[in-house]
């Protein structure tokens, strides 16, 4: 869509105005006439008509300055400055920015980038002057990026292009938007031009005369002719320009300008007349013969018609350029042109190189080499261009015209400070002349360069180089430019003294502008004119006379006539205001097609057929097979161009109604090209960055554990739960404990079973059992609270016990955000299975001296020596010491005392010495009471996370018994801390924090289940443990994780959303459907849905940290509120110093990635699938806010519409294909569509791409289900890797070849056929043979048909996944064994480099000779491995290079440290596969009733739109009949049959001529010519239009007869080239009609016309 599709802002151009400096006032340097014109422009719309160099731009700057109050920010209005070329845009932006202090931004582009509404809105808010090409503004207005109401001042440079009878963007802006009734406020309009007219001007009767005896080198000074001029066109141009711009043309008296601007003297130099020499004629004949030879070779080598036509056109253009240079410049000029093409443009003219007789040259190079040889033979032997003198420059070496140019340059070249521009029409001529002039010694004083547009196709010309050349010309480094029209306007060239028109200007404006380049005083404007060429003389005369006439007409108009305005049909979208018209409909349609999915074998593009009807020309538009629909017919129009525009407008309207165009009339989401912002990163990167962003969220506290209504100072009834511990193996004793809570736990919580993982693989299975309620008196409650506080201090904060006194009962307040529960030791009653709290044990612990006030501690009781022990802090009874906690200050360690070793004391032997000696040597302690028995003690352990997925510390897979480790301690080195706190009690308490953490999480999951259950009953089908698994991330490092559920849920979500989009949006292509699905399933959207349902509070994303275990008796000390939240939880902390990032506060804050919050949605879907099936998952999706429902009629419409493909039934063996697939289709059209490649467009139906989208989605789910169920123990990442291997294009392509379904692919691309054949041959080789060959690129189409086939089965079965499951297992059986596993080599290479710390370099691919050359570099310490590969597909080339690099690294001995997938699958536990969760009721679909009809009717919808009418019912019926009567076609699967030549004689059989000029359409009598009928027949069958050629003219001039032949190219199984000749006729139309009659008769006999049809012509 041209410039509008890409408004690339050039901030550099407007850099000076980006900041406000000192005020700039452009009035200080303005001339009087500029100020006068500016004053008038402030008051009304005007068009300033001044010559080049008269300061028009400065008047515009003055106007911007005067109206600055309207655009100064914060005003929402702007000034828009339009310039028709990119150099002008850049130049004018710099001028405005340097002359004013406005914020300026300029826009231009080539369609590679695009800007959205938000970016335009931002720029309108930031900048005050926007300088752009008119196409950008036009498209921005059409798509409502910019509205006319927001423009305060509209400036149009070179505004003469705005003519109502033209479709220039200037004219369209004014016609469609300035004159629109919807515009409330119109901007001020200011136009600038050096010539207010367009075209060639008037043709005066005066002609140039050349005085006799004058040398060709002497100029003819021209004098203005008088009279005889036709002024009407000038008047119309000026009147029309004023009317369209709503402005008045204003100018300045010539006398005032003469003192300011110099006007060059004009001189005319004659050459010729042109009479080509014999040598030139011979060269032309030889070049023609060379062209024919190249054509024959090209046709013989290429079997693809489209490819050969493209190459032929390139060859013809090349030949025509060489011939033109030969005639205009001579043989040496043509030789230079050929050499230039050969060195620069070979690839441009013929991108895909094809070998010729073993040579590596392309057809273009073959022709150029031959042309160079021919032209070189005619050059004087041993001579060089630089050695020639002026006298020797004669024809045919140089043409006479070129010799005159050299004479002119020789004459003026010796003048001081001379600078010259030579204007030519063609780029080829510019380059050839420049090359020759640079090498002529006689012109060595000229330093020459050529200047052409950067869009000219020249590889060595860019905008930067253009600017550099102009800069060098201005500085004098270059003093001669050979330029095309790009030098006439848009480039600031001010110091030119001589302008030479080698070729005449084509318009008056071109004449004036090129002349205006000679701005210096005493400048010359030289025109080369051919002698005796009357048309050229009249043309030049008209240009010269036109300027005077324009001035007269501006002063006093002689007529009010104007050109008729070209009316446009417009379609407008009501809710956005976006609009399209017939002016832009063609470009918009091409833009839509350009955004359709494509591959290297197919380029989507519309095809146009024209039908010459009675009421006018009708255009039939055929869209690509992957478009939303296939055909649109326009209304009868007077010209092909208007008919084409009308058909395109109808197509665009229908595309919008089908959703393929958005409400802003742009290609819908999912277009092939990513819409990349020119100022920001891509939207994909933004979404990715957002998903990785961390946010602070609270974690939910289980409501059942909150202390609601509990008072510690009163009687309370608590629910009693017995905590069960089952050690495996039974190598430890555990004190029985009870859990006491205020509210009863949910029933599902009572089923809690947790494996607590100890060292060496040992496990304790823990659970709870409800035993009823128990009453707590006030004293008992306080006692229990103190006991729990004591236990937690010993486990987590035991450093407090190093002091002689510890106070309990400080933290007895109950916070609303905290939990309340009690963990107390229990014992079995003496009778029955009843349990009770072991209050004596509690009281005994709390009676320890450390908890008493020092002043309250009585003197130790006296014990007998046999019953007591002397400890560090006194004498204690042995019964108090055993089963207590002691502290040894000499090593700062706490111990459990498990017993007293009566037989061992300090004198006993220990490690070759006594214990006394050991303590003296090790700790320098002299024991005072060595006779005391030693204590058997066990060090108190640090509390650990027992939910951790700990790896066994030995190679044994099961836990083994582990003997406890005890030490012997002298009692006198220990101080007694807690009496009665035994080792068994400590062991139990070490398990309880992990158990309670899991219980809290389970209670949170139950709460979420209750929330969902209140909204949909299907939530009852999922267990709380399943929900908990779906809420727990891998970061928790537990034995449960959401990742497996997430993998399954992600695949299911893509399937059901893709299915919904497929059925709902029938008009969207594969790419748009993918984008629509992505909009729903992407992390950003899932995050929003999750936040809306507050799922983030349920997520568990941190591993249990025992040090941050808070419970009654150990409350959280970090009080968090809104005032300190940000300070407490800082995010911008270095990863190495993030102590506070996971700080636990009173509000349970934690940091969560957005992606994690999104992943939980998918994991919950997976959980519902596994436990509740599809129906439960659908209910959850509806609750979360994802719509996946659709109406059955929508499916029926899709099934019914598939019958359009039944016309292809003869292309393949349907029964055989169904047998290969293992499924019998009810709707055969679906099966046929699944095998139609988009390159095949010779039918009315579509291609497989939409079915491929659907099949890809369902295949991903069923493969995921297969892997999930078959391998229950493999990691989620490994499931993803295996799935990628299974559904990768290579694997699917292998499956297609193994099952031979690829032979049924319907295609029309010889390149694709060749690629498939190469791949098929490779697949069928043995492994040893494959090792010797490079694997060919896998054609994507092979994998696509497997996916589209799966999609077709899904639709035909009414979404019955059981059928899809069976077909998948059969088709992919060789793949699912994973026998020949091929991982992605690029991924494997990246992982290998990361594993070993190698630096991986991937330079950008370089394209040359039609192939991508890819390099892979790996830096191994001081050595670099470099591997390269080349392929037409860049991904394939990178794959090959990566494979070679991997091979080299493995040869060096570098391997991945982790197990490969092959090794994992060998040992993985395997179960029988199953289709997970499928309990959906399939839709009842009836058999296709039209299956017996080989030729279904095609119904074209009528398209209503503004200012147009819909008809063509007649054409649609005709199309139906043509399809119905078509003979058998065959795509040949790429086999190119040479066309048969069938020639029909000029005379027709009598039965053919007896038929009359009428054709019956279902009872309607419609008159139609045979020629028109033939055009319609070709269009209906998607053939090329018939070609009529004049064969012979005979007879005298007044009785001349014409004989025509018509050529019809019939595509199909028997490709036929039909030629029919007419009899001699007095009129050409009659001869064409007679030939068409013969063609129709032959087509009827061949079966391409219904036998029952009566065709009389």
From Swiss-Prot:
Residues 1010-1173, 1214-1358 form the RNase III domain. Involved in the RNA silencing pathway. Cleaves double-stranded RNA to produce small interfering RNAs (siRNAs) which target the selective destruction of complementary RNAs. Required for the production of 21 nucleotide siRNAs. Regulates shoot apical meristem (SAM) initiation and maintenance, leaf polarization and lemma polarity through the trans-acting siRNAS (ta-siRNAs) pathway, which probably modulate the expression of the ARF2, ARF3, ARF4, ARF14 and ARF15 genes. Can process endogenous 21 nucleotide siRNAs derived from an imperfect inverted repeat. Residues 1-14 have a biased composition (Low complexity). A motif (DECH box) lies at residues 157-160. Expressed in roots, leaf blades, leaf sheaths, shoot apices and spikelets. One of its GO terms (biological process) is ta-siRNA processing. Residues 856-978 form the PAZ domain. Its cofactor is Mg(2+); Mn(2+). This is Endoribonuclease Dicer homolog 4. The record marks 1340 as: Important for activity. Mg(2+) binds at residues 1252, 1344, 1347. Residues 37-214 form the Helicase ATP-binding domain. Residues 1384-1451, 1569-1645 form the DRBM domain. Residues 1533-1547 have a biased composition (Polar residues). Residues 585-675 form the Dicer dsRNA-binding fold domain. Pfam families: DEAD, Dicer_dimer, DND1_DSRM, Helicase_C, PAZ, Ribonuclease_3. One of its GO terms (molecular function) is ribonuclease III activity. It comes from Oryza sativa subsp. japonica (Rice). May interact with ARGONAUTE1 or PINHEAD through their common PAZ domains. It is found in: Nucleus. Keywords: ATP-binding, Endonuclease, Helicase, Hydrolase, Magnesium, Manganese, Metal-binding, Nuclease, Nucleotide-binding, Nucleus, Repeat, RNA-binding, RNA-mediated gene silencing. Its EC number is 3.1.26.-. ATP binds at residues 50-57. Residues 400-567 form the Helicase C-terminal domain. Belongs to the helicase family. Dicer subfamily.
